[in-house]
Amino acid sequence: MLNNYTKTYINQMARRTRTDITEMHLRVLEFAFAYYEKNKVGPLYTNIERHTGATKQDIHRLFPHGLKSVYTWIGIPIHSVDDTCKPVADIDVDEYREVYFDHNGTTYLRDEVKPFMEKYTRGDYGHGNPSSSTFLGKNAFEKISTARSEIAASLSVNPHEIIFTASGSEANNLGVKGIAFKYHQTKGHIITTSIEHSSILESVHFLGMLGYEVSFLDVDENGLITEDAVRSALKSNTILVAIMAVNNEIGIINPIKEIGELCKLAEVPFMVDATQAYGKIDLKPKEMGISLMSVSGHKIYAPKGIGALYIDDMYSVVPLIHGGGQEFNRRSGTENVGHIIAFGKAATLARKEIQSEYKRITELRDYFIRQLKEKVPGHIINGSIHNRVPHNLNVGFPGIDSGTLLISLNKIGVYVASGSSCSAGSKESSRIIKALGVDTDYYGTIRFSFGLNNSKEDVDYLFKYLPEIIEQIKDN
């Protein structure tokens, strides 16, 4: 029911616009108010018609500015129906279930890892200060050493080449700035791409402000960074090349080995953000010409707040955090022992499962695409369908607000990531989607990323409701 404040405001707006309030006006306004109170977003025309009988034409006849007037008269906090997230779909769900299709964003703590975290939390082991000489401290140090060996084994590198950090972002900062600061007097030239993770981009922008020269490479029509593009950008004063292995938004696999060989010949350090590749594809930095490589725990079912940086024996970095000299004097601060232990166990499991999971996820992805083609005509898949990890599908839906679709899917228990905050074509539209030449004013993009617990039943659940959701929210 409308509260007294809202009723007073409605009467004021009616007087200002010289609108005579009828029973139909009140029916529409009361429904819209109740809908917003429940869903925190205004209803669509189809929602209003279904529950009140008022058609789109009726609403534009009854209210001076159509749906916008309905929203403003009852105090829905938007400035315009057109430049914000639009009303979400109203779907009746038969058997509700939760489906998590956002594994590129983060993953849950897998069951096999939980016991190690629980033992640490209870204080059963590993809770001493690893820098101390006590028995508890030595035990914690040994647990870290074991985890370091587990991470190293997953990359076929030496344990002492693994530096633990608080996140993948910190690892990226340490890799990029740690190399660049060695040249703080002469500066130098850095090559990266326009589609890197923000922890890389912001780092090189910062270095640019300090006087370093930075070249940003663009992707080709398939979303790839080519070896030729890197070769053309190399200069005599290039001090670092930083390129991601797998793109977080469209899942494209860059030709890292070829670029690594090129950098090795040019004697230029090669930094790779492998956050989205680690645990999905085989990574062997020493065979790929990679000098530094960042990985993150929460992308492979380990806890959040733990990452690592591989630094080849041939290279050193200037530390960003000074203090007690932990992590071979490269990253000071008492180590997060429990998370490091869990990271090591998750890395071991990922290493064992990498081939079988790749095959299973590929079959699941292909099944998803078949359902997509059959039930959602007019869509596009962003990026090459062949040269990508199967764990990721970035789909463009014509005439759809990606933010509205994301919220509509959330309401039925399906969790995904959108290409922009509220609408395709907004200022926050993805850099890489634009770089591919996609019309972001027309296509709203959604990223579906698959993981360990996803099944065909999850895909079936999504496509049971997706066509109706799209029908309700699409621009006509």
Residue ranges and their predicted role:
Residues M1-A14, R61, A89-D94:
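Histone-fold modules and their flanking histone-like tails across chromatin and transcription assemblies
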Residues I10, Y45, K56, L67, ...:
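Generic structural marker for isolated residues within well-ordered, non-membrane alpha-helices
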Residues N11-A14, Y36, E49, H60, ...:
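Residue-level preference for well-ordered alpha-helical positions
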Residues I21-E23:
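Short helix-coil-helix linker/hinge
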Residues L26-Y36, H51:
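Amphipathic alpha-helical segments that form the core helices of the histone-fold
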Residues R27-E30, N47, F135, E363:
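Amphipathic alpha-helical interaction segments
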Residues L44-D90:
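Helix-rich interaction surfaces within compact, conserved domain-sized segments
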Residues V88-N476:
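Pyridoxal 5′-phosphate
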